[in-house]
C-alpha cells in the first residue's frame, strides 16, 4: 500500500 503524493508517485 502507498499513498499518492503527486501525479503517479507513491510515498
Curated annotation (Swiss-Prot):
GO CC terms of this entry: extracellular region
Disulfide bonds: 2-11, 5-10
Subcellular location: Secreted
GO MF, one annotated term: toxin activity
Free-text tissue specificity from the UniProt record: Expressed by the venom duct.
The entry's keywords: Disulfide bond, Secreted, Toxin
Predominant location: secreted
Domain notes: The cysteine framework is XVI (C-C-CC).
Protein name: Augerpeptide hheTx1
